[in-house]
Amino acid sequence: MQESKEQRVHGVFEKIYKNYDQMNSVISFQQHKKWRDKTMQIMNVKEGAKALDVCCGTADWTIALAEAAGKSGEIKGLDFSKNMLSIGEKKVKEGGYSQIELLHGNAMELPFADDSFDFVTIGFGLRNVPDYLTVLKEMRRVVKPGGQVVCLETSQPEMFGFRQAYFLYFKYIMPFFGKMFAKSYKEYSWLQESAREFPGMKELARLFEEAGLTNVKYHSFTGGVAATHIGWK
């Protein structure tokens, strides 16, 4: 019986959780932190904000949201991998982030009421869900009117030559790094597949609009290897 995408992805993240943060830095050459910082600048999260970080993983973006919102903020992080959440819980406890609550759950069926959050984010997680549009619609449902839905994700470079080099890197070098640093060649081979199949910037912007979001904008990083998309409700 063939594994579903959801089962396969769950297995990947349950296995690579211990080395996930290190591998993010290796694979992106530390750029993922700069991309997130720039995205946070664009979002302009205010003191006391309520935010949800979907597919929060080890909670790096969740913590960034908490630092921006301050002690009066209310931040939720949700992920379907208990092992990834265990790393996040340790960070939250060590940092004393009392405004953060991490939850085990499914991005396809968010366990929150309509119009609950000022910001709903997803970082390097949308490409791994079974249905992109369903998750975007769920994110729109739980964000407040006037709130932002934000996705930071790998993208598809458009410049000839660089695009080909990018896909060669993802196909051959990234799995090699996975084997060398995390002993997880198979799992990182899957992650390059998910990145290759993920929509480009214009197509993802169209999906944001199809999900009912308005004034959709996107910002390209590092020649198009990643992008932030923001839409309003």
Swiss-Prot record:
EC number: 2.1.1.163
Enzyme class name: transferase
Keywords: Menaquinone biosynthesis, Methyltransferase, S-adenosyl-L-methionine, Transferase
Catalysed reactions, semicolon-separated: a 2-demethylmenaquinol + S-adenosyl-L-methionine = a menaquinol + S-adenosyl-L-homocysteine + H(+)
Binding residues annotated for S-adenosyl-L-methionine, in chain numbering: 58, 79, 106-107
Protein's GO biological process: menaquinone biosynthetic process; methylation
GO function term, MF aspect, one: demethylmenaquinone methyltransferase activity
Entry keyword annotation includes Transferase: yes
Pathway(s) annotated for this protein in UniProt: Quinol/quinone metabolism; menaquinone biosynthesis; menaquinol from 1,4-dihydroxy-2-naphthoate: step 2/2
Protein's job: Methyltransferase required for the conversion of demethylmenaquinol (DMKH2) to menaquinol (MKH2).
Family of the protein in this entry: Belongs to the class I-like SAM-binding methyltransferase superfamily. MenG/UbiE family.
Protein name (database record): Demethylmenaquinone methyltransferase
Species of the source: Bacillus velezensis (strain DSM 23117 / BGSC 10A6 / LMG 26770 / FZB42) (Bacillus amyloliquefaciens subsp. plantarum)
Gene behind this protein: menG
